[in-house]
């Protein structure tokens, strides 16, 4: 009997792109002005609406486009002109050598993203959700089917979009500094069944100002 085919189903999707340009001097100067206005953890800015500042309007547009690309490529809505991903919160992270970010998720958010402002060589690690399995098998080699942690290499200008309930972390930083801009988002518009025999089921209109 031939060996059975392994078929991955219900994959978790992340997208990664590069904004394709350097950060302008005035953008960098403005973002660096927040490095001394961080929370007690010494990393996250107190301002959690950083992308609402007019000085970062172009950067916000790039982040918004990446969210819309994810929405259309992954969710593929039947009503693309009546639904979008709306950025709800955004903040800067200033990290130094030997610091790290614990494993965490983002609550009250559908998709979140990280734009790397200053990260010559960095990594974001995604962790598989706990399936409730109560056993451990040492694998001969790691594959997409048995990996528990997936590191993704990133650098300055990279923009990563992923589901907000996906556990992620940042390993110990080996460079002098790491600056990133993180943001949350939520559906804005109409969701649920829009057309067909199920029309109206779970229909919801969301209006985020």
Residue ranges and their predicted role:
Residues 112-114, 176-191:
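A short hydrophobic beta-strand segment most commonly corresponding to one strand
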Residues 168, 177-179, 193-197:
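Extracellular and organelle-lumenal recognition/adhesion modules and their flexible linkers in secreted
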């Amino acid at each position: 009997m031939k060996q059975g085919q392994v078929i991955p189903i219900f994959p978790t999707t992340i997208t990664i792109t590069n904004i394709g340009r350097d950060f302008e001097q005035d953008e960098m100067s403005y973002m660096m002005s927040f490095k001394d206005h961080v929370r007690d953890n010494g990393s996250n800015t107190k301002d959690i609406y950083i992308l609402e500042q007019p000085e970062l309007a172009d950067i916000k547009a790039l982040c918004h486009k990446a969210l819309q690309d994810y929405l259309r490529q992954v969710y593929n809505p039947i009503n693309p002109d009546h639904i979008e991903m709306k950025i709800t919160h955004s903040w800067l992270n200033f990290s130094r050598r030997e610091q790290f970010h614990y494993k965490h998720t983002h609550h009250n958010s559908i998709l979140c993203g990280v734009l790397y402002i200053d990260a010559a060589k960095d990594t974001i690690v995604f962790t598989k959700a706990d399936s409730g399995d109560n056993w451990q098998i040492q694998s001969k080699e790691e594959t997409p089917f048995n990996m528990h942690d997936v590191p993704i290499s990133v650098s300055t200008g990279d923009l990563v979009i992923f589901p907000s309930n996906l556990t992620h972390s940042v390993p110990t930083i080996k460079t002098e500094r790491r600056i990133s801009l993180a943001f949350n988002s939520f559906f804005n518009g109409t969701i649920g069944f829009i057309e067909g025999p199920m029309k109206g089921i779970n229909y919801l209109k969301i209006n985020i100002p």
